[in-house]
Amino acid sequence: NMITAEPIAQAEQAAKTAALNGVLPAFDETAAETLTIDEMPITVYTATKGGQLAGYAVESMTKNGFGGAINMMVGFTPDGEVINVNVLKQAETPGLGTKMADADNVLLRSVKGQKLEEKKLVNGKLAVAKDGGDVDALTAATISSRAYVDAINRAWMAYKSVAMGATPTDVSSGATSAAGDSAEEQTSGPEAQEGGQNE
């Protein structure tokens, strides 16, 4: 088993490096910090080049995908603009939710090159148009689209926590209400989308 463990670890490291390269400008070093947000591990990579801050890459996830968990890498400039989003793992419906991994898909176009705080937020978070936000959803894949946005929101919280020292609870509750409210919001999400139709 040791024979296969080494190449698998190398392959995973290579995939991680490729994912970082896909969402960050040129860098020569990264420092990783893992936070727990909504009981999920979210890792923030602070990238530097020649000792200067180059950007942040956040390995984020959601458990609300139509086909289960979705993992992604989200890159931010030092001042919070989304550089790129790289979907690392998803099991969404082929031809519908899987489009979230396509280059230049509508979800990506809704966030790439933008500062998320300047978007139309709902309770301080990104949301798809159907939920009052301004992120365009994938056609016939609203649940997948909501899950994508959920993972981006978590990445944004982690970025703000590391880059600006905001605590994830402050960020998730919009800093005005008690942290209990955000926990309540979380639980109502997945139940509302049961029923088999990714619509």
Q: Where are the predicted features?
A:
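Flexible, solvent-exposed loop/hinge segments and secondary-structure transition points
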Residues: 1-199
